[in-house]
Regions:
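Short, hydrophobic, well-ordered secondary-structure elements
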Residues: 115-116, 333, 337
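A short, sequence-level motif marking secondary-structure junctions
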Residues: 139-147, 245, 251-257, 341-342
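GHKL (Bergerat-fold) ATPase N-terminal catalytic module, capturing the glycine-rich phosphate-binding loop
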Residues: 1-189, 193-194
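Single conserved hydrophobic/aromatic residue that forms the stacking wall/gate
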Residues: 340-350
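Residue-level signal for short segments within beta-strands and strand-turn junctions
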Residues: 126-128, 230-232, 344
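Glycine/threonine-rich ATP-lid/beta-loop region of ATP-binding domains
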Residues: 172-333
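Compositionally biased amphipathic helical and low-complexity segments enriched in hydrophobic
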Residues: 50, 313, 337-340
């Protein structure tokens, strides 16, 4: 006699809001999915955080709190939605760890359940570049939150619609050439709260800091740029102070190296003058101690290069780990690179 596992409808909670127990992690996973889809830009927008009807309405309206994550990646067609997005634990990362000239960043197939962690409803809009129509998939996560031992997750029927550009605009979504828009509605967490004499936006500030981890500090040298933008229109209109606004609104940059300049000792070497010279600068806590400009003996091979080596004391190491979530020894340690060269002398380390 053969047996098999049963996927009870409560599986959604186990791999959704119960597993992903942090809002920042949930949003980061969704941004990683956009990165893996070759998006050049991802916009994260919070709507109706201050005044909404979340507690007074059963479903949702135009005044209900929303988190909208929009990317310009490759997008999906109905086969992608059916065979990939709705296929629990399906992950492109399992098949290939590198695509679109990028190392894939997403988790192993459960990132889409981050939407459940963040809100009660989801409207997923998507379009591939070659298509003239938009696909809308609607999910009400409450449909999976029933106490029924016999009901399996595949018993919940999900419907999709094909939308024209006009129909998309009527739903308040700006048309796009390709990509995905996740409209997460009726947010489960309180992202801001009133604290006399102003709104406390610390949770949004913390999100911005957390998302910096996905941005390469060396992005200026990367061919494939990836931008993350955080928006909260209610507070952008209200807050006229540019410095305060920059804490959680606008493009997210990883400034860890810039901050390290004022907390560590560094040696910076840059090839200049089309490879003719090298400029070496020694700095301590942001102050130049010594510099020297010399002839580049390898001008035939190196025309344009820049290298910065930081010496981190215990305080600087702790700061780096707090900012990036990575121990310095696991990020760019000279000792680590030496081990790679010894074990794989032909491998190029960039």
């Amino acid at each position: 006699m053969n047996l098999h596992f049963i996927t009870n409808v409560q599986l959604k909670n186990i791999i959704g809001k119960d597993l992903i127990n942090n809002d920042n992690i949930a949003i980061l996973e969704l941004v990683k999915n956009a990165f893996d889809a070759n998006a050049k830009r991802t916009d994260i927008s919070f709507v109706n955080l201050k005044n909404n009807d979340d507690l007074s309405i059963e479903k949702y309206s135009s005044r209900t709190s929303r988190l909208i994550i929009r990317d310009n990646g490759v997008g999906m067609d109905i086969n992608d939605i059916k065979n990939k997005w709705l296929n629990i634990a399906y992950s492109e990362k399992k098949k290939k760890s590198y695509q679109h000239n990028r190392m894939m960043a997403g988790a192993k197939g459960v990132g889409r359940f981050s939407c459940d962690r963040l809100g009660e409803f989801l409207n997923l809009y998507t379009k591939k570049e070659e298509s003239s129509e938009f696909i809308l998939l609607q999910l009400n996560w409450r449909q999976f939150e029933v106490d029924d031992e016999k009901k399996e997750i595949q018993d919940v029927v999900l419907e999709y619609e094909i939308l024209s550009t006009t129909e998309l605009e009527m739903r308040g979504i700006k048309p796009f050439k390709h990509g995905v828009v996740l409209e997460i509605i009726k947010l489960r967490s309180q992202w801001v709260y009133w604290e006399q004499p102003k709104w406390n936006t610390e949770k949004l500030v913390n999100l911005r800091t957390y998302l910096e981890r996905l941005i390469n500090p060396n992005q200026a040298f990367e061919k494939n740029d990836f931008g993350i933008y955080l928006n909260a229109p209610e507070f952008e209109e209200e807050n006229k102070n540019a410095e305060e606004k920059a804490k959680f609104i606008g493009r997210i940059e990883n400034s860890v190296f810039e901050k390290l300049n004022f907390k560590a000792t560094s040696i910076e070497c840059e090839v200049q003058d089309n490879g003719a010279t090298t400029l070496t600068t020694l700095k301590d806590k942001g102050e130049t101690i010594f510099w020297i400009k010399e002839k580049n003996e390898f001008s035939d091979f190196i025309k344009d290069a820049k290298c910065i080596i930081f010496y981190l004391n215990p305080y600087s190491k702790a700061f780096f780990t707090k900012q990036t979530g990575i121990r310095p020894v696991n990020y760019g340690s000279i000792y680590l690179l030496s081990l790679i060269h010894i074990s794989e002398p032909t491998r190029r380390v960039v």
